[in-house]
């Protein structure tokens, strides 16, 4: 079953510097941007976090975990959510 790394920029209050947080999700079907956004929204509502940026969801491709994390750091500053397929 494919495993996705999903990362999003969050803040826990006004004036804070945004930081990346990540989690993995497994799905038998391929996940598209709207499904990724729904998962992030659910997680943030439970944790009391706020999404930072424009709300844009960006696919960063597939690769080893460290490759996907590296590509996350290359995302444009206004990008809110990035996700990629992690090879096992």
Which residue stretches match the model-derived regions?
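Short amphipathic alpha-helices in soluble, non-transmembrane regions
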Residues: 36-40
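Compositionally biased, low-complexity segments
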Residues: 3, 23, 75-76
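A short, exposed loop/beta-hairpin motif centered on an aromatic-Gly-Thr core
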Residues: 17-32
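Short aromatic-glycine-(Arg/Gly/Cys) micro-motifs in beta-strand/loop hairpins
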Residues: 1-20
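Residue-level signal for the start and early helices of compact helical domains
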Residues: 14, 35, 59-61
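A periodicity- and composition-biased signal for non-globular, repetitive helical segments
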Residues: 9, 15, 32, 43-45
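Coiled-coil-like amphipathic alpha-helices with heptad-repeat character
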Residues: 4-5, 32-34, 67
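Short, mixed-charge low-complexity intrinsically disordered segments
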Residues: 41-88
């Amino acid at each position: 079953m494919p495993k996705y790394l999903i990362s999003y920029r969050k803040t826990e209050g006004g004036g804070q510097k945004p930081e990346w947080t990540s989690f993995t999700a497994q799905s038998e079907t391929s996940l598209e941007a709207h499904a990724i956004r729904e998962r992030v929204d659910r997680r943030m509502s439970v944790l009391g976090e706020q999404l930072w940026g424009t709300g844009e969801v960006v696919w960063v491709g597939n690769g080893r975990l460290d490759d996907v994390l590296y590509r996350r750091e290359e995302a444009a500053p206004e990008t809110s959510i990035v996700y990629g397929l992690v090879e096992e």
